[in-house]
């Protein structure tokens, strides 16, 4: 667990070592790209910090549905959206999901049932992202919906 503040030189990206524990390469990939997009998009947002500190973010800012009430909420949303688009390009993900789900019906979004979950797991492995990241990406592309009993 990171302390609330860690001294770093400007431009450094610090990844908690617990992220690389276990077998979750997909989560690691997403987190690294999320942090890279902070460097690309939000470099100026953290320039006022003296000395050079990085603040750890809470899990709710990185995952799940949260209303964008603060500047931090918004920049976390942007980094997540860009990481998702980079790792799971819209057209490629959409085409692959349509190909894999063609026997489940042609009307999208599909309810996220056991069959769809199986496709999500396979696609997450193929794109080297977490199952949760693939689930959110397919939902944001309106390919799946969480209105099925599995998620209620």
Regions found by a protein language model. Give the residues of each.
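Active-site hotspot residues in diverse enzymes, especially metal/ion-binding acidic/histidine motifs
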Residues: 1-152
